[in-house]
Regions:
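Alpha-helical membrane-anchoring segments
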Residues: 2-213
C-alpha cells in the first residue's frame, strides 16, 4: 500500500467517524424525560414571570401606560423592516378590561403548558405569550427573559409532554400509549436538549468574555 493510499484511507476513515459522531450527537434517539422535567420548571418560571406583573399590570402595559402604544410604535418604527418580530398580543388590549382578559388567558395557557395539556400546541402558545410581554415592555427585560424565551423555543421542538403530563395520562387511560408512542426515545428529544445545552454554553462563554472587558 502506497503512502497516497494510506492518506486516502486516513481521511476517509476520519470523515466517516466524524459523520457518525455528528449524527450520534444530534440525532441519536434519547429519552424525553429530561425535557419533561424542564417543561415543569420552565412553566413554573414563566408563571412566576407573568404573575410578577399583576400589581402594576395596567400601569405597565395599558395602551396609555408608562410605555404607550404610540411610544412603542415609534420605537419599533426604527426597524420597520423587522416589525413583525415585535409581535405582541398585548397591543390588542385597548382598555384595562381587555388587558386583564388577555392577562388571565395568558396565565391559563402557561398553566396548561406546565401541566402538559395539549403540549404541542400550548408550548408554542406559551412562547408567544412570554414574547408578547417582552415585546410590549422591553425596558423591563434583563438577563432572565432571553434565557426563558430560549428554553420555551427549544421545548417546542421536542416531546416535552411525553411524561409527567395530562397528555401522557390521557393516552395511558385511553390505551393509546404503547411502544414507539409518545414516551419512546426519539431524535427530536435529542435535538431539543442539544440546542439547549449549546445555547447555555454560549451564554456562559459570553458572560465569561464580558468579565475580561
Amino acid at each position: 500500500m502506497t503512502m497516497s493510499q494510506d492518506n486516502d484511507n486516513y481521511w476517509n476513515l476520519l470523515n466517516q467517524r466524524t459523520g457518525r459522531s455528528w449524527n450520534r450527537f444530534w440525532f441519536a434517539p434519547s429519552d424525553p424525560l429530561p425535557l419533561c422535567f424542564l417543561r415543569l420548571a420552565v412553566g413554573l418560571l414563566s408563571l412566576t414571570y407573568l404573575f410578577s406583573f399583576n400589581r402594576d399590570l395596567v400601569r405597565l402595559f395599558a395602551a396609555d401606560g408608562l410605555m404607550s402604544t404610540e411610544t412603542m410604535e415609534a420605537i419599533r418604527g426604527e426597524a420597520a423592516i423587522q416589525g413583525w418580530i415585535y409581535f405582541s398580543v398585548l397591543d390588542w388590549a385597548t382598555t384595562p378590561g381587555i388587558l386583564w382578559i388577555v392577562h388571565v388567558v395568558s396565565a391559563l395557557i402557561l398553566i396548561l403548558f406546565t401541566l402538559g395539556v395539549f403540549t404541542r400546541t400550548t408550548s408554542v402558545l406559551s412562547l408567544l405569550v412570554v414574547l408578547s410581554y417582552i415585546h410590549r415592555q422591553p425596558v423591563l427585560t434583563g438577563p432572565f427573559e432571553p434565557i426563558l424565551s430560549m428554553l420555551l423555543l427549544y421545548l417546542c421542538l421536542g416531546p416535552c409532554g411525553a411524561y409527567l403530563s395530562v397528555d401522557r395520562w390521557r393516552a395511558t387511560t385511553q390505551g393509546v400509549a404503547k411502544v414507539g408512542g409518545e414516551g419512546a426515545a426519539c431524535w427530536t428529544a435529542t435535538v431539543s436538549l442539544r440546542l439547549i445545552q449549546l445555547h447555555c454554553v454560549g451564554f456562559y462563554l459570553l458572560m465569561g468574555l464580558s468579565k475580561l472587558a
